[in-house]
């Protein structure tokens, strides 16, 4: 098995820590909030407020399940538009009260069902991209599994984008890439090599800003490393004026 195939397998592993795991382990007194105030709650997106070293932080994440029933409840981590609208509601609330935002991303992509399209999936994603680009508080986005397509990017327009070591971030799945390019989904491993989807490759290209090591570390050590990195980064970002924060975010994405 090639290195990229191993990483792809680990990124999709059902036993990986979820967004909710990180929210509860990293932040004190995490309180989950629900609903988009428009249609319904979406179990594929979690969000709420917690404290980090005494500072209030808004946490948003895309949640996969740990077993079949949980995955059915979470729609296998594929958000509907109401999930993205819930996320945006919480981020705008964070802006109102001056709370930084941390997002945890693990999704193969936004849900492509008929109902989701009828309720404006494309609009919901596009609005998140627009609003996050101008959100007047610090944002840190962390890929914790799969970072698939616009469904992942809708929570990743951030001042800093990080990845865990054994995760992926791509425009679409390797299977989808192979099907489109070669009409053969079985060539997914070959596609993954071409796509440059691993954390190391994306760090080298400047797409992500930090890779958090996983191999050889206990779960508790990984959680502590993420917590420390968030504390340090928020301390730096909080020193910037709103104008400088937004300009740096703008330039970060303009360079692509």
From Swiss-Prot:
CoA carboxyltransferase C-terminal domain location: 1-236
Catalytic activity as recorded in UniProt: N(6)-carboxybiotinyl-L-lysyl-[protein] + acetyl-CoA = N(6)-biotinyl-L-lysyl-[protein] + malonyl-CoA
EC number: 2.1.3.15
Principal place of residence: cytoplasm
Group of enzyme by EC: transferase
Superkingdom: Bacteria
Oxidoreductase in keyword set: no
Gene Ontology terms: biological process: fatty acid biosynthetic process; malonyl-CoA biosynthetic process
Subcellular location: Cytoplasm
SUPFAM superfamilies: ClpP/crotonase
Keyword Lyase attached: no
Alphabetized PROSITE patterns for the sequence: COA_CT_CTER
Family statement: Belongs to the AccA family.
Function: Component of the acetyl coenzyme A carboxylase (ACC) complex. First, biotin carboxylase catalyzes the carboxylation of biotin on its carrier protein (BCCP) and then the CO(2) group is transferred by the carboxyltransferase to acetyl-CoA to form malonyl-CoA.
This protein's name: Acetyl-coenzyme A carboxylase carboxyl transferase subunit alpha
Organism: Streptococcus thermophilus (strain ATCC BAA-491 / LMD-9)
